[in-house]
């Protein structure tokens, strides 16, 4: 299962992703976190 959450900053994407991860065995991958890690 692939799910993509899109929205403006503060829209609740992270909150929704956390709830989805609790109910389904899928990983939560934050592209924002990946980007920040890559530029450091």
From Swiss-Prot:
Keywords (A to Z) from UniProt: ATP-binding, Cytoplasm, Kinase, Nucleotide biosynthesis, Nucleotide-binding, Transferase
MF annotations from Gene Ontology: adenylate kinase activity; ATP binding
InterPro entries recorded: Adenylat/UMP-CMP_kin (IPR000850), P-loop_NTPase (IPR027417)
Highest taxon above the source species: Bacteria
Stretches for region NMP: 30-40
Residues noted as binding ATP in the record, renumbered to the chain: 10-15
Subcellular location(s) per record: Cytoplasm
UniProt-listed GO biological process terms: AMP salvage
A Pfam family assignment: ADK
Binding positions for AMP per the UniProt entry: 31
Comment block on domains: Consists of three domains, a large central CORE domain and two small peripheral domains, NMPbind and LID, which undergo movements during catalysis. The LID domain closes over the site of phosphoryl transfer upon ATP binding. Assembling and dissambling the active center during each catalytic cycle provides an effective means to prevent ATP hydrolysis.
UniProt family annotation: Belongs to the adenylate kinase family.
Function per UniProt: Catalyzes the reversible transfer of the terminal phosphate group between ATP and AMP. Plays an important role in cellular energy homeostasis and in adenine nucleotide metabolism.
Protein name stated in the entry: Adenylate kinase
Gene for this chain: adk
């Amino acid at each position: 299962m692939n799910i993509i959450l899109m929205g403006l900053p503060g829209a609740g994407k992270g909150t929704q992703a956390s709830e989805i991860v609790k109910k389904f065995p899928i990983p939560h991958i934050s592209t924002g976190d990946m980007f920040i890690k890559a530029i450091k």
